[in-house]
């Protein structure tokens, strides 16, 4: 991923802006593809326990595996869809930073503050959030889609602080990704223990 040198001695990821000859729609589609390839597998451990609980409630149903798979796909689609507002916000910030060099010089400090605040919010909210939303009604495809989307929306909200910290620290930095994966894995283990 290319970098754009910015005032203040730091560089911004080029993924927030269309490259030469690319439309904004193409840039957004590229980002959402990258977002899906990165966030869905990283956050998947958090979906395992609720999906296993859902499958357990369908015990005795002939379509339990299929309905659980449909709920899992709806969960993944919700995470993919969450990439669009992230891209729109990132693109707006990137445009503002290119237009306002004074703001660009302050960005490393602002990113550090946002990263610490996002991580603190994630850790503080960790204990008080519910494990997962209530289970749906009759076991049909629409209910499985609705349940998976509800689980996905809950997971996106639950991980919003972590997402802010990840974006502030540099979404494509390996060390940042490793820290996020370790945190998600630890939270997944903790949720399964409850």
Predicted ranges, named:
Residues 1-36, 94-106, 125-141:
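Histidine-/acidic- and/or cysteine-rich, low-complexity loops and terminal segments associated
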Residues 1-3, 66-126:
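Membrane helix-loop-helix hairpins that form the core translocation module of multi-pass transporters
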Residues 23, 31-76:
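Juxtamembrane transmembrane-helix termini in multi-pass membrane transport proteins
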Residues 23-31, 67, 71, 108-111, ...:
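Residue-level signature of transmembrane alpha-helical entry/exit and packing/kink sites
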Residues 35-38, 114-122, 184-188:
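Alpha-helical transmembrane segments of multi-pass membrane proteins
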Residues 37, 47-53, 147-153, 159-168:
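Generic transmembrane alpha-helix signature in multi-pass membrane proteins
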Residues 63-92, 158-193:
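A small-residue-rich subset of transmembrane alpha-helices
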Residues 124-162:
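Membrane-interfacial catalytic/cofactor-binding modules of polytopic membrane enzymes
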């Amino acid at each position: 991923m290319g970098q754009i040198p910015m005032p203040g001695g730091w560089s911004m990821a080029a993924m927030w802006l269309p490259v030469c000859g690319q439309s904004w729609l193409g840039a957004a589609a590229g980002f959402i593809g990258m977002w899906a390839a990165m966030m869905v597998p990283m956050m998947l451990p958090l979906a395992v326990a609720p999906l296993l609980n859902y499958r357990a409630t369908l015990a005795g149903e002939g379509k339990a595996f299929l309905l659980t798979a449909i709920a899992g796909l709806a969960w993944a689609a919700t995470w993919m869809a969450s990439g669009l507002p992230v891209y729109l916000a990132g693109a707006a910030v990137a445009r503002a930073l290119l237009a306002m060099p004074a703001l660009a010089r302050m960005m490393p400090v602002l990113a550090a503050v946002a990263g610490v605040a996002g991580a603190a919010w994630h850790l503080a909210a960790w204990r008080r959030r519910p494990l997962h939303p209530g289970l749906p009604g009759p076991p049909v495809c629409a209910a499985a889609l609705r349940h998976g989307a509800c689980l996905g929306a809950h997971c996106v909200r639950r991980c919003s602080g972590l997402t802010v910290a990840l974006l502030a620290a540099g979404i494509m930095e390996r060390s940042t990704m490793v820290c996020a994966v370790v945190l998600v894995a630890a939270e997944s283990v903790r949720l399964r223990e409850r």
